Design a protein with these regions (language model features):
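Extended, composition-driven regions rather than compact fold-specific motifs
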Residues: 2-295
Length: 295
């Protein structure tokens, strides 16, 4: 295999994609991958950053926004992914050993016993020039690595990040979006960054009116808030019902984006695939959490 790019981030991205594909499709033979040339051998992992908490604010009673700073954030704006994998210090792993680049070009962990737990979160707002970004955390009961960390986060705390991760958003003239609290940061970012001419409708489900937050919507997408008002998250069908009720316009490029509890995501995905015959190039329906599972 040969990879070539004019920029180190691009080269690292290509090598990562190629090595991942080889490991997946040739997993039975388990070939050894050893790169030569630039960015070869063990060393600093290009997609890793050690981030520092700048400040923590309460957006709503159950949503915190944490601003983090880190060096060289250009790659997080270059590859289209909205998300990052966050590596959290915990009581059981208070001093993590961070990942490095292995000889195969992929993530390598020098000490598995000090490998931190990780979860995927959305970059809510990214300021490359300022060297900082915001991540919104839903604070909730039960065991949750991300929620527990965010609840205790203070200025100066450290956390690792890998990324960006996730499928890039395809350009479209019209969108239908649906999200509960877990997908809300991504919807907010999209509404603040898509072209002003973008049309469509976005449904956002939250616990009650107190959880509604300000979104600087720069598009022509209509935003509708849905309140559970006492219904437990994951039990209401209102969000999926609303998204599935939308008629897609003809003669414009459309895109469907949905992120919520697993059962709701499956309903919407099945509707888009089976009832409307829409493919992966036109839709994303993701399970951001599963009812009954610890986070």
């Amino acid at each position: 295999m040969r990879a070539r790019s004019s920029h180190p981030d691009g080269l690292a991205r290509l090598k990562d994609l190629m090595a991942t594909s080889v490991e997946f499709y040739a997993r039975e033979s388990q070939p050894q991958i050893v790169w030569q040339g630039d960015l070869s051998g063990q060393g600093e992992l290009e997609q890793f950053r050690l981030a520092t908490v700048v400040n923590v604010i309460d957006l709503t009673p159950h949503m915190k926004r944490i601003r983090l700073k880190a060096p060289n954030l250009e790659r997080f704006a270059s590859f289209g992914g909205l998300h990052i994998r966050m590596l959290f210090p915990t009581a059981s792993v208070p001093n993590p050993v961070w990942p490095v680049r292995g000889n195969n070009g992929l993530v390598s962990w020098p000490d598995e016993n000090r490998r931190p737990p990780s979860r995927v979160y959305t970059i809510r707002r990214l300021e490359v020039a300022g060297g900082h970004f915001d991540v919104d955390f839903l604070i909730h009961e039960g065991e949750s690595v991300g929620s527990n960390w965010a609840s205790a986060a203070r200025e100066g705390d450290k956390v690792g990040i890998l990324g960006p991760v996730g499928r890039p958003l395809r350009p479209a003239d019209w969108f239908v979006m649906g999200a509960d609290e877990t997908g809300l940061p991504a919807v907010g970012r999209m509404l603040e960054s898509l072209p002003a001419t973008t049309r469509g409708i976005a449904f956002i489900e939250v616990a009650d009116e107190g959880e509604r937050q300000q979104i600087d919507n720069l598009t022509a997408v209509e935003v509708k808030w849905l309140y559970r008002n006492g219904v437990t998250g994951g039990e209401s069908t209102a969000l999926a019902d609303a998204v599935m009720s939308v008629a897609w316009p003809e003669q414009v490029t459309g895109f469907g984006w949905f992120a919520a509890e697993a059962a709701a995501a499956k309903r919407v995905r099945d509707h888009w695939r089976s009832d409307l015959s829409l493919g992966r190039d036109q839709t994303i329906a993701s399970a951001y959490w599963t009812r009954g599972d610890a986070g």
